[in-house]
Amino acid sequence: GPRLADAACIATMDRQHVPQAVPALEKGYDLLLEKPVSPSLEECARLARTARRTGRRVVVCHVLRYTPFYRKVKELLEAGAAGTVMTIQAIENVGYWHQAHSFVRGNWRDDRTSSPMLLQKCCHDLDLYLWLAGKSAARVSSFGANSFFNAAHAPAGAADRCLSGCAAKENCPFDAEKIYLTNAATGIDAGNDGWPCEVLAAHPTHDSVREAIRTGPYGRCVFACDNNVVDHQVVNVEMSDGSTLGFTMTGFTQHNTRFAKFMGTAGELTADLLAGEITLRQFGQPEQVFSVDAAEGHSGGDAGLVRAFVELMLGGEPGSGLTSLDVSLESHSIALAAERSRLAGGAAVEIAPLL
């Protein structure tokens, strides 16, 4: 049929992106594409070639670039506030219940049907820190495993499902009733009818969510699921200029948030997303604190991304944050190289140019 619009948004599961994006480009659509592009480097390259041949634009949803918080970090680092950045230390605190929801019980638990967790969860972060520091990656090494969410760690008396008479339920923080019904931050009984409850039921109520826990995948014991992705991973990146990034992704945290420290030749800058605070300590000077309120939806990044995409479609210039396919693929190359390193016992892997 005829083309129906100027642009299309592709937000399906990871392995469906490229098979849907290629025909859309051939049809003449510009694309707003959910990350990750694909767990296959060959597919990523195929999409990039198609975009070039058709002259269409593909913008990848690296939403963190569009947050007021990280835009302020970028402004300070670009102005040389910390000098030349030599060391970056960063952590993705996934959050204990988010790990259980998305990567143990949920859609991204199995890398054979989705993608490695580092690519799914942290191509965001890898893209972000390279952009903030103005760096490109040369080599990577990585360690990590699914060390806890497996049958060996099931407590005594655990059942296969949380509502099937589990004797360990009372003291289990991963209990589905706690996460989806009673938890003040996530439970439907506390009025949380958005994510994650909306994943269990289209119109979340106490009854619809409880029924989903009783019968669906989100009511399974976290120690009795078919998950194979990691629950913690560390990544070391050597940049092309010799500077380094040490990155940790872990599900064993109270909050799901990001924290980073940029250490440079003139000072250090810490970025605490949860507190909404950026602290600059220039050597020998009093510290400066910048407060940036975090908005809803990836700290305001979701709305900022869509705004930037619409402006691009209306003929505006692509802003510095707008992540083109070519730029996005660097973070995919790093994440997939890190996964190769992890599977090879931590051996260093060179980051080859993808295109």
Language-model features: where?
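Catalytic cores of eukaryotic secretory-pathway lumenal/extracellular enzymes that build
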Residues: 14, 18, 43-46, 65-67, ...
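A short helix->loop->beta-strand "cap" motif at the edges of active sites that frequently abuts
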Residues: 27-29, 54-57, 244
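C-terminal helical cap and adjacent loop that interface with cofactors, partners, or active-site loops
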Residues: 228-355
